């Protein structure tokens, strides 16, 4: 097993964190572009949101199939397949003359993103010692949020300065270089044992989990809160570029810096759970979120 602070540990944790960073950069790249692309393709706000929804939906649907595939062919191969597919799919978006084709390529991007997201933690569990894993998972989660912020801000600034196609090309080049770095740093697994014929086993386990009412409640709470959280940013993007603010997309995308508040609060969660419990924490989080949404209704703050 790879121990904490060893040279191998640093390589593995950086490679997986950077891979996760690339995944979330690509997932959220299009969110600040939505107002611009709605005008470009002459579609409604509801229709343009499919650019974001298609990739997220495809990602969620493909997590289990990719995880099952990795049981047979290995975690590393699945992760690298996803990473190297991402820039190829990104460049294919440049051929989108019709809106439906861009939605389709974004859905394919979600499939590629799921390849990495579904098995990175499994790789860590199998290769890292328990102490090393405990430290590594924190950096991995932090990379998720930093990737989301970077993708959103880069998408807005590059679209504002150069156009959406150049933003996509820049992200594709960055992702390709990053994928090469991850492939170089991430070692072949030493503790992986291939297992085949697990597709139906995992499906039965998934159905069993879905029959658990407590899990349904937990998933409902998490799903609703995440949907409100993500879509509020989309709504604010449309609001900030419209009257009376009329901000450029690049400036409007800076609202995603607020995402860092979640990065900070997630670090405090462990301390909260040690002193209190999860349920009061969820209630407090919901109240703070509700307060934020009510504040967002205010048109302007008087000087």
Where are these regions (language model features)?
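Juxtamembrane intracellular "pre-TM" segments in multi-pass secondary transporters
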Residues: 2-5, 187-218
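Helix-breaking motifs and short loop linkers at transmembrane-helix boundaries and internal kinks
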Residues: 42, 74, 95-101, 129, ...
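Conserved MFS/SLC helix-loop-helix module at the cytosolic interface between two early adjacent transmembrane helices
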Residues: 61-97
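Helix-to-loop junctions at the C-terminal end of transmembrane segments
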Residues: 63-74, 264-277
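Structural signature of the two symmetry-related core transmembrane helices
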Residues: 78-91, 280-294
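Paired small-residue
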Residues: 89, 100-108, 303
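Cytoplasmic helix-loop-helix junction between adjacent transmembrane helices
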Residues: 105-144
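Helix-loop-helix hairpin linking two adjacent transmembrane segments in secondary transporters
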Residues: 139-186
